[in-house]
Amino acid sequence: MVHRIFLICIVISLIGLVQSCRPTRYIEKGDYLLTKNVIHINGKDSVYTGISEDALSNVLKQKPNRKLFGLVNFHLGVWNFANGRNPDKRFTKFLKEDVGEAPVTYEPALLTRSAEQLTKYLNNHGHFNADVVTQAWIDSSSVELHYFVNTGNEYKLRKLGKSFEDDSLKSQFVGNKNDALDKLKLRAGSVYNTDELSKERVRLTKALRDLGYCTFEKIHITYDIDTNIAGNYFDVIIRFRNLRNVSNISGVDSVTTAPHLKHQIAGVIVNQNFQVNGLKGSTLDSTYYRNYLYLSLSKPYVRPARIVRNLFLNRGDLYSQSKMKYTYERISGLGTYRFIDIDFEQAGTRQGVPQLDMIVNLNKAPKQGLTFETAGTNRSGNLGISSSVNYTNKNLFSGAEQFNWKVYGGLEWQNTNTSLEGNQNSVIRKTLINTYEYGSEVSLTIPDFLFRLPGRDLPRIKEPKTNISLALDRQGRPQYDRNLINTTFQWTLRLRDQDQLTLAPIDISYVQLEKTKAFTEQLNESRNVLLINSYSDHIISAGRLAYSYTTQDFTNALKNFYYYRLSFESTGNLLRAVSKPLNLQESKGSYLIDTIAFAQYVKADFEYKKYFILTRSSSYVIRLFAGSGLPLANRKALPFDRSFFAGGSNGIRAWRARAL
């Protein structure tokens, strides 16, 4: 506790020191430190607009220095602090370049550009009569920039039309029930928005490519927009253009047009020995499996049956961009290949329909790996060391099965101990190393649903996996020794890109505790039934269901996102129901397995995290966790391993795990 208070005092003193430095101390005469941008939208007029102040702030060309928690000018203060010191010192350079931030000075040219960008942004979002007036409020050596924005009324869509250069393409819209084509996002009443128009172009292009039009690109969609309509309305005509082919004949460029045609898959070729460097390898053997042609050296690296379950285009299918992308994602999810490329080649025509060969080139990753890790720890003055060896096999049975075997161990010297009441306990093992842990974990992950119903498939579900694991662990503490055996069988799957569902019908644990006499006496003296039951031998036979969701955008590392997880666990209820028919031993209302009362409870928890991205390497995270467990008839308390606690790397890090 003393260490924490000391650390907090240092942080407060550092912030005070940084703030005490005059922010404008290094601002040259005639320059002004930009302290604030203020955007005034429509003054006091009650003109409704969907434009937010944050959205407008993002387009400004000049922004003030960042502030810690939005209040403290920390980064500028650090820069000022380091600027007057020896620049050759590494620590000074680190403070100035990595932590600090140079003062942002006012530039009139950027103020003008910001006003232009605001006007452009408003025009792009349907405010064609927008007006922006700027003012610079100068005070001594600092300045505030004020933007007075009059958005005007929004322009809304009155009428939407379509125009086609090819009647065959038109047939995909007229009377077509395809949701991607029939339900356009653009409709009467929509506010003019260039971003939405671009998204509509992308969505329509994808929809047509999924229908077999592999030559169709975004450039083949253009918009004719008429804003000269009374009442703040506009009309749109979406034009679908044919292919443009440019040729040069006798030095003269000529452009010819051709209609877009649906393409069909003539065949699928899987090359499991593709050479990334372009060098030709040995002669490959060819094998046909379910209409797919496989090329490999003698025995295929991964069984064709496993690859087939991850291919979603077959001979005779129409080309589909979504199915091609899904195929790539599923093969990538196997974790067996380090290079994946899917290409299409023209293969003539069949009954007037253009044909494509789909070629899947794969280059395998190293099959086996061995890693060694070691770490030193210092938790509240308790020194320790831990090590682990991890063996990985990415293709154990030639079906992309991931096998992991981990052996680990750790030692720690706990020089103090706390009793149940929070007082210092003098009963400690007088050895240099009085805390240890060692064990082993074995897991096998199969990229499929093991034991699924015959003939049943879930093609829309992403990355179906079955995980089987076994763990053995022994912990030694000053108060007790603990032995754990755990085995788990679970399925995981993704319904969408951003969520995951986990179902574990089997999660069995056996925990044995060997308590010291002094610790046993402490438990008995506490008369706390909850603690006594928690620190006793127990058997857990659980079933678990969990769902998680995240809005993280992996294409935009600077975008804020959130994550939440819901979990429900039920233990011992089925076992309790069959205990009497099975004639299990009963003691004091609890049924026993080998003299141990098995756990019976229901438990639910919820976790929420909000990530505020500061830079590419730092973020501010808010975490909320709530849970509830209800012990049932067979046992009066939750087992120690399944009880709720705080502290540790996944909780409040200032305290050790289970210290709160």
What feature does the model see in each segment?
Residues 281-283, 293, 377-380, 502-660:
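C-terminal outer-membrane beta-barrel translocator/porin domains of Gram-negative envelope proteins
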Residues 300-301, 320-565, 653-654:
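Gram-negative/organellar outer-membrane beta-barrel architecture
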Residues 5-14:
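Sec-dependent N-terminal signal peptides
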